[in-house]
From Swiss-Prot:
It comes from Vaccinia virus (strain Western Reserve) (VACV). This is Uncharacterized 7.8 kDa protein.
């Protein structure tokens, strides 16, 4: 009978602490840098592109976290 390897409580809690922490740190860094770019490029199209890029970056950052939750 094959048993599915279940992560221990410490492993699970560690991933729940480390991943959101790293995501939030990276999120803050990207938000600040994108905020500067957005301020410089205050005309419509450029700001819109920067905004879209920012959203895509955040989605990419959250992807491993989401996968980790699903697995």
């Amino acid at each position: 009978m094959n048993s599915i390897p279940v992560p221990t409580l410490t492993e699970t809690s560690r991933s729940f602490i480390i991943i959101p922490l790293s995501v939030s740190i990276t999120h803050c860094l990207t938000r600040d840098s994108f905020g500067i770019v957005r301020t410089i490029s205050s005309n419509g199209i450029t700001a819109h592109l920067v905004n879209s890029l920012y959203i895509l970056c955040n989605m990419a950052l959250l992807l491993p976290y989401t996968i980790n939750l699903l697995l």
